[in-house]
Swiss-Prot record:
GO terms for molecular function: heme binding; metal ion binding. One of its GO terms (cellular component) is endoplasmic reticulum membrane. It is a single-pass membrane protein. PROSITE patterns: CYTOCHROME_B5_1, CYTOCHROME_B5_2. It comes from Neurospora crassa (strain ATCC 24698 / 74-OR23-1A / CBS 708.71 / DSM 1257 / FGSC 987). It comes from the Eukaryota. Belongs to the cytochrome b5 family. The keyword DNA repair does not apply. InterPro entries: Cyt_B5-like_heme/steroid-bd, Cyt_B5-like_heme/steroid_sf, Cyt_B5_heme-BS, Cytochrome_b5. PANTHER family: CYTOCHROME B5 (PTHR19359:SF150). Heme binds at H37, H61. Keywords: Electron transport, Endoplasmic reticulum, Heme, Iron, Membrane, Metal-binding, Microsome, Transmembrane, Transmembrane helix, Transport. The lineage of its organism: Eukaryota, Fungi, Dikarya, Ascomycota, Pezizomycotina. This is Probable cytochrome b5.
Amino acid sequence: MSAEFTYQDVAEHNTKKDLYVVIHDKVYDITKFVDEHPGGEEVLLDVAGQDSTEAFEDVGHSDEAREALEPLLVGTLKRQAGDPKPKAPLPSSLAPAAQTGTATGLGIGLYAVLVLGGLAGFAAYQYLQAQQGATAPSA
């Protein structure tokens, strides 16, 4: 699509029946997708007619979600003086390996802490049970 939109043009499309968003300076008509969005329509209506780059990236959408945007592309954003600055820069690499590596590293560390904490709790429980058994009077 070679159409160019200004922020003012995009801002006019801010209802459930006519919904445009800007993601990384690309304009998408997501009207037909509103009812299908896994996060619900409220999430999309909150960013209707606006630059939703930051909200889109904060959620950490999958590659499939990014691919689903392609057929909804209607043009590009034509920046003008006085327009708000983009809130989130375009990631230098959208490669799944780069994104997954960071998330996986954190996930493994988190699991390690949980497992070690569970083992420490179990060991403390066993120790206290043994101490209670040793100090209990015989009947």
